[in-house]
Amino acid sequence: MLRDGNEGMFTIPGFSQIQFEGFFRFIDQGLTEELHKFPKIEDTDQEIEFQLFVDTYRLVEPLIKERDAVYESLTYSSELYVPAGLIWKTGRDMQEQTIFIGNIPLMNSLGTSIVNGIYRIVINQILQSPGIYYRSELDHNGISVYTGSIISDWGGRSELEIDRKARIWARVSRKQKISILVPSSAMGSNLREILDNVCYPEIFLSFPNEKEKKKIGSRENAILEFYQQFACVGGDPVFSESLCKELQKKFFQQRCELGRIGRRNMNWRLNLDIPQNNLFLLPRDVLAAADHLIGMKFGMGTLDDMNHLKNKRIRSVADLLQDQFGLALVRLENVVRGTICGAIRHKLIPTPHNLVTSTPLTTTYESFFGLHPLSQVLDRTNPLTQIVHGRKSSYLGPGGLTGRTASFRIRDIHPSHYGRICPIDTSEGINVGLIGSLAIHARIGYLGSIESPFYEISQRSKEVQTVYLSPNRDEYYMVAAGNSLALNQGIQEEQVVPARYRQEFLTIAWEQIHLRSIFPFQYFSIGASLIPFIEHNDANRALMSSNMQRQAVPLSRSEKCIVGTGLERQAALDSGVSAIAEQDGKIIYTDTDKIVLSGNGDTAISIPLVIYQRSNKNTCMHQKPQVPRGKCLKKGQILADGAATVGGELALGKNVLVSYMPWEGYNFEDAVLISERLVYGDIYTSFHIRKYEIQTHVTSQGPERITNEIPHLEAHLLRNLDINGIVMLGSWIETGDILVGKLTPQTAKESSYAPEDRLLRAILGIQVSTAKETCLKLPIGGRGRVIDVRWIQKGGGSSYNPEMIRVYISQKREIKVGDKVAGRHGNKGIISKILPRQDMPYLQDGTPVDMVFNPLGVPSRMNVGQIFECSLGLAGDLLDRHYRIAPFDERYEQEASRKLVFPELYEASKQTANPWVFEPEYPGKSRIFDGRTGDPFEQPVIIGKSYILKLIHQVDDKIHGRSSGHYALVTQQPLRGRAKQGGQRVGEMEVWALEGFGVAHISQEMLTYKSDHIRARQEVLGTTIIGGTIPNPEDAPESFRLLVRELRSLALELNHFLVSEKNFQIHRKEA
């Protein structure tokens, strides 16, 4: 619950509520709508009829639990059963059976779906709303050309445009346009009806000549003319039913189906009263649109802003799942139709069970969740990431935009985003502005609009009412901005307040206000709402902070922030990582595995806890019990904290003592200097779990097998395997050790043996193994402890069932040089040096500083909020207080943030008897000492407690070295990237740098032996072993030879010539 400055109480909606409401709408309405569209299917002789009785369909409770679905790599889904009937018209008999249609993946309590053991989430898509939109563009002569775009429910466009002679054209393609009278006549209107239904009949009569009047004389002629122009067909086509069907399929179905949203928008924009159930474009719509276009030409009416949210709609999870369900039913219809015809042809008696298969529905949803761009793997780096992912909104995807074609105006912030889409939280890079995040109070309306709540101000009654407004409604209201919340009712009537009206920001009297914001967080997303003092930060830095909080790694010992915003508890609660008591009761047993709670009766409920579970970002998800045995609980209390939560609050980082000062250049360019206390005290230690898997296959020589008897391998590498050939739980694994022993059979032909094998067989008669080892080995950087092994046997119809073995290894990672850390204000940096604590700068009470940041990173980046947080955090640490501060506290008075921080520092200095905490000469700063010499620094320095996060970008995942590896086939140069064991490339600029220092031999090595000279790099190994001199290469490297070949493909021969020193005679020598 949040209370604003004056009165009224408002509950923050659940952060996953949008996902829940969308899925519930699909189950409650979408399934029924699509099932009612399923037609009655008859055979060719119309003797048998198949139909579904959709009013009594049922979904069965899943047979497995969520945890089991994840563990066994299954889909958490429900079976759909629908009654079906098969009617014989000749005998009037009917056979009714309840048939299994397929599996529908369900949504769990996190708002996600589990498909093949993987958490997946469907994000919301923003599309152009169907309807008509008017805009004006300048042609090459600088004259305004007015156009009206009719957008269908499927995204198809039809353009109407009016030229300088006031002639109206319908554009059927980029190059073809025809008179507006032709499509109107093709849709069934004659010329008299057209003239009777328009406001400007004289304009419609002005431009058709006798030839054009003949084209629209009848509907058939109009359809032929329309088809000829649309399909670019020459000659004289003949009117036929097939031609009409083709035109219907290619044009009218794609460009003229408006849908419910399009019909509502069309009626509202053109002031029509066509019934809402009429979902297709009518001649009356086209004529009204042309009338409106003529009015635009003569200065009447307003143009449309295509980027306004009232002209956008949201495709939520309900719409996407319903579309896929409809697609699956169409496929099922084709299957049933083909099966009926086949049964009649072979004189078989069909039954509903035989006609229907579950394959279309199951495969459609598996394909959707696995391949659709809007179905993404849930990012589970930390609890915040999980809930933010489900609230994303994207302009990308099918029917949407692409990152390369989207204009700057689409990406930019729009006034209609206020309270609906966060103006800060978006992705960086090519998709900036195209992937946003919904504001925390926003909700999705029934017809796909984003609604935001406001308090309605009534002059008659003093009661406060909450109303949700869609983007097309709040333009008619004067909405007071958030800084008017703290005014008293008596003073408000005399105040002049800033307000928003028709996308403009005004300053008006309070009595003219209709609505006001409910809370300052209203227009921010969850990530931006967790930044304290966000009003003091530049928006670009706040954007970085919103993104970097989602990259924070859960630490082994979490700690909640001293300075927060108050939303930490709600974020942790809605993320689902904490265990919550679902009823009143008493704790009767607790351990690391489960908590047993006794309810009101004698029943005991066992609540399993998550123990060292791997997320898809390799972070560790773990729950720790927080309740002792014998404690009585109320419903909703915390039973166990999850990863990155403490006491039910979000805890992504640590409160550490920081100072802003240069230190020997080690914090140059955002580098960070840290104390060794952060390493040895396990302050920033985190656990990471990696998954390694191997699968057995059936080869042409026989099946592969798992065993611990691997020939030709050292016993040291096999020391951790059990009798089955699988690594034992609890083993400590080093790089190169065998995790799973596997042998693959190979051919026993004599020619396939190596020479030494043939020699052994000939001399000693030893039988050489006919299997090669294809074991699962631990790669570089994977050392750790085995915490879980899963042996999954996949069932199948064959005698051999493939097996999959997964090994989970836990790593303990301390913070080290190269790791990335960041604050909550966009202040990020890389660890450059770890100093002994005695060498770190220390305070006047002897406390060494934990981190040293560069002070130059503050003024130019304008993220001053970190200074307020730093100073207030120091006061909170000394006073043992936690602060929760809403943004924009300047709405109370000027310099409110400074007036909050300084009194707290003053009180801390008094209570702790440390006058250096608050010195009036330089408040917020203190004189500190150099740990190496003990001398004070020349200038006072800002010191304090900041909340610093350790990010997922860690040096252990990025550092890479190569001694030998693969080469590219064409250029024969080392591959690129850590994943391919690639090498460094000495490019053009690197060669310039080497040439600048005159290092000729190093340049030659880099360009020949260590790169793409095939013969030379083979000779290097032998000469190195015997200690000889590496010979100079005699021919050109492979990249030069490639250049020569490419020139030859262009018919250019490249030769080189030698000029003798004596007589300068030219001797030709072939290259």
Curated annotation (Swiss-Prot):
It is an enzyme of class 2 (transferase). Its main location: plastid. GO terms for cellular component: chloroplast; DNA-directed RNA polymerase complex; mitochondrion. One of its GO terms (biological process) is DNA-templated transcription. PROSITE patterns: RNA_POL_BETA. CDD domains: RNA_pol_B_RPB2 (cd00653). It catalyses: RNA(n) + a ribonucleoside 5'-triphosphate = RNA(n+1) + diphosphate. Signal peptide: none annotated. It is found in: Plastid, Chloroplast. One of its GO terms (molecular function) is DNA-directed RNA polymerase activity. Pfam families: RNA_pol_Rpb2_2 (PF04561), RNA_pol_Rpb2_3 (PF04565), RNA_pol_Rpb2_6 (PF00562), RNA_pol_Rpb2_7 (PF04560). DNA-dependent RNA polymerase catalyzes the transcription of DNA into RNA using the four ribonucleoside triphosphates as substrates. In plastids the minimal PEP RNA polymerase catalytic core is composed of four subunits: alpha, beta, beta', and beta''. When a (nuclear-encoded) sigma factor is associated with the core the holoenzyme is formed, which can initiate transcription. Belongs to the RNA polymerase beta chain family. This is DNA-directed RNA polymerase subunit beta. It comes from Drimys granadensis. The lineage of its organism: Eukaryota, Viridiplantae, Streptophyta, Embryophyta, Tracheophyta. The gene is rpoB.
